């Protein structure tokens, strides 16, 4: 891989290689008192986040450090960005200072692609950690890793993605990747939260959740992104929860093997009931744990591309 910007252009062989590497890394580190591999020693990884993040930012930082890379965090508010410096100039500065890889989260859709274009001649590689409402490829990869652990191969599996599709970069990335890996995807949301052009995503679209439950292998719940909304997309949080929330009654209607995912942060009591979030059938903590190993695998494929040094 030259960069990781989206899952839309990720072929099955590359995606599977990353997932397999993540599994190998997880097993390699299992039970170790010191979780450290020398694979990326001497490499410099910079995280550049223009939006708030807990899981993704910490996960990338841990991933880089566990691979022995030097990890530098650039905060938009505490850097020259706060003085008005452009994304392009900031990126070129970081590359000139020796960054081998820049991990970027930005509120503008397409920001990671533009960054990769500006840095193409420098050799610095780019990972998209979420760009606006466009994509979040490493989230989709860690979701796929979690599903593979719970369900085995994903070909032929049926996965529902439920909630705020309109504002969700997670939904877009997951649809592309799950379909590439052979899964069937059904999108479930109120009509007001379905984006234009969704018919080109290659997934089924439904507006009612309950009829879908008995035939699902997995349900991925999305947070309602109120911070991106300017208007009434549904009558109330209570009515949304009644129609689309994963409660104990709905959990009981899923097949026994079915797994519940959530990319976080969760709104307990809205899209997911606390009892469901804490149920053994939910793999939410596993997603976070797998996120570290998947991001280690992404950095490995971008920066090393050799046998994993144990």
Swiss-Prot record:
It catalyses: carbamoyl phosphate + L-aspartate = N-carbamoyl-L-aspartate + phosphate + H(+). GO terms for molecular function: amino acid binding; aspartate carbamoyltransferase activity. Carbamoyl phosphate binds at residues 55-56, 105, 136, 139, 264-265. Pathway: Pyrimidine metabolism; UMP biosynthesis via de novo pathway; (S)-dihydroorotate from bicarbonate: step 2/3. PROSITE patterns: CARBAMOYLTRANSFERASE (PS00097). Keywords: Pyrimidine biosynthesis, Transferase. It comes from the Bacteria. Signal peptide: none annotated. Its EC number is 2.1.3.2. GO terms for cellular component: cytosol. L-aspartate binds at residues 83, 169, 223. Transmembrane segments: none annotated. Coiled coil: none annotated. InterPro entries: Asp/Orn_carbamoyltranf_P-bd (IPR006132), Asp/Orn_carbamoylTrfase (IPR006130), Asp/Orn_carbamoylTrfase_sf (IPR036901), Asp_carbamoyltransf (IPR002082), Asp_carbamoyltransf_Asp/Orn-bd (IPR006131). It is an enzyme of class 2 (transferase). One of its GO terms (biological process) is amino acid metabolic process. It holds the Pfam family OTCace_N. Belongs to the aspartate/ornithine carbamoyltransferase superfamily. ATCase family. Catalyzes the condensation of carbamoyl phosphate and aspartate to form carbamoyl aspartate and inorganic phosphate, the committed step in the de novo pyrimidine nucleotide biosynthesis pathway. Heterododecamer (2C3:3R2) of six catalytic PyrB chains organized as two trimers (C3), and six regulatory PyrI chains organized as three dimers (R2). This is Aspartate carbamoyltransferase catalytic subunit. It comes from Saccharopolyspora erythraea (strain ATCC 11635 / DSM 40517 / JCM 4748 / NBRC 13426 / NCIMB 8594 / NRRL 2338).
């Amino acid at each position: 891989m030259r960069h990781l910007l989206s899952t839309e252009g990720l072929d099955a062989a590359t995606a599977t290689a990353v997932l397999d590497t993540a599994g190998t890394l997880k097993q390699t580190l299992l039970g170790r008192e010191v979780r450290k591999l020398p694979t990326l020693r001497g490499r410099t990884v910079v995280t550049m986040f223009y939006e708030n993040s807990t899981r993704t930012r910490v996960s990338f930082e841990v991933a880089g450090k566990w691979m022995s890379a030097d990890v530098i965090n650039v905060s938009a508010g505490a850097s020259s960005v706060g003085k008005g410096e452009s994304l392009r100039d900031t990126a070129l500065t970081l590359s000139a200072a020796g960054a081998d890889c820049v991990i970027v989260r930005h509120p503008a859709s397409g920001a990671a692609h533009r960054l990769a274009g500006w840095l193409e001649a420098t050799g610095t590689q780019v990972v998209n950690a979420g760009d606006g409402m466009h994509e979040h490829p490493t989230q989709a990869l860690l979701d796929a890793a979690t599903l593979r652990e719970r369900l085995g191969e994903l070909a032929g599996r049926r996965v529902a993605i439920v909630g705020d599709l309109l504002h969700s970069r997670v939904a877009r990335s997951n649809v592309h990747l799950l379909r590439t890996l052979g899964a069937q995807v059904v999108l479930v949301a109120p009509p007001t939260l379905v984006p234009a052009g969704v018919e080109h995503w290659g997934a089924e679209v439904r507006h009612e959740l309950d009829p879908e439950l008995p035939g699902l292998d997995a349900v991925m719940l999305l947070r309602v992104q109120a911070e991106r909304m300017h208007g009434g997309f549904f009558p109330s949080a209570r009515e949304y929860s009644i129609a689309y929330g994963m409660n104990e009654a709905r959990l009981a209607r899923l097949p026994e093997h079915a797994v519940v995912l959530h990319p976080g942060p969760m709104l307990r009591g809205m899209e997911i009931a606390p009892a469901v979030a804490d149920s053994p059938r939910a793999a939410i903590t596993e997603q976070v744990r797998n996120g570290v190993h998947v991001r280690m695998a992404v950095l490995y494929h971008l920066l090393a591309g050799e046998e994993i040094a144990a």
